[in-house]
Design a protein with these regions (language model features):
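Short, well-formed alpha-helical segments that are part of the catalytic scaffolds
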Residues: 8-22
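Acidic helix N-cap motif at the loop->helix transition within catalytic regions
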Residues: 10-14, 37-46
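Short beta-strand/loop segment that forms part of the nucleotide-sugar
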Residues: 25-35, 56-57, 86
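Residues at the starts of beta-strands that form the adenosine-phosphate
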Residues: 27, 52, 191
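A conserved acidic beta->alpha catalytic loop
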Residues: 32-41, 90
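Acceptor/aglycone-binding surface of glycosyltransferases and processive sugar-polymer synthases
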Residues: 54-77, 82, 94-175, 202-219
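Terminal low-complexity segments of carbohydrate-biosynthetic enzymes
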Residues: 95, 105, 160-161, 189, ...
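Catalytic donor-sugar/metal-binding loop of nucleotide-sugar-dependent glycosyltransferases
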Residues: 145-146, 169-173, 182-199
Length: 239
């Protein structure tokens, strides 16, 4: 289970404990972007007391996508067959991880979804929900995806699936990083299933959402859509 962190010292201990309780044989990788609040040190202390906890110290804040890509590489190099994305702030419920892993047995990617029947959000500001729903709808329409929650970040991948997504070409971050992986999985013909989840608004710390993340998502998704349509017209394979 890969958990990217930046200034999550107040959250990381609890989220790791919840993961370990929910799936006792799971390993956790905390990928910390040199957090000024000492998140990396807290994670190191957890790792000393639990052989299932590992820490990847990164040189600085490079974004969600870069942290996950580093985590994927680490997981692949260490021989893991399944790699999971999970937020550090408690938005993703570790107690729902067993359902994702069960769904993955019959799929290549199990995606935790807020927008399928049974999925929901709790205590999320209305404007954030509108941005997320709107972003998913815009991405789905422009990219021709059937996945309902393309911006969601609670996902379980088979490692061989990630190996087939051309991760060396991924440069996106934030919202559009998740869209990018979803579209690559669909375009590559992988079997993607959505599992209803409960998404909780964080109680401690500040959201990492920013205007720059939204702007990047808009222009990248639009670019992928235009390129994809042009490739179809010209009979070329999508990148």
């Amino acid at each position: 289970v890969i958990i990217p962190t930046y200034n999550e010292a107040e959250n990381v201990k609890l989220i790791v404990a919840r993961v370990r309780a929910a799936v006792p044989d799971a390993d956790v990788l905390v990928a910390d972007d040199n957090s000024p609040d000492g998140t990396g040190k807290v994670a190191d202390e957890l790792a000393v007391g639990d052989s299932h906890v590992h820490v990847l110290h990164r040189k600085g804040k490079e974004g969600l996508g870069a942290a996950y890509l580093a985590g994927f590489r680490w997981g692949s190099e260490h021989g893991y067959g399944v790699l999971v994305e999970m937020d550090a702030d408690g938005s993703h419920q570790p107690e729902e991880l067993p359902r994702l892993l069960t769904a993955l047995k019959g799929a290549d990617l199990a995606l935790g979804s807020r927008w399928v029947p049974g999925g929901r959000v709790v205590n999320w500001p209305r404007h954030r929900e509108m941005i997320s729903r709107g972003g998913s709808l815009y991405s789905r329409m422009l990219l021709g995806l059937s996945v309902r929650d393309v911006t969601g970040g609670y996902r379980a991948f088979r490692t061989e699936t990630l190996d087939g997504l051309g991760l060396d070409e991924v440069a996106s971050q934030g919202y559009c990083f998740q869209v990018d992986l979803a579209r690559r999985a669909v375009e590559a013909g992988y079997h993607v299933v959505e599992v209803p989840i409960t998404f909780m608004e964080r109680e401690i710390g500040d959201s990492k959402m920013s205007r720059d993340i939204l702007v990047e998502a808009l222009w990248r998704v639009t670019g992928w859509g235009i390129t994809g349509r042009a490739n179809k017209v010209l009979g070329r394979k999508a990148p």
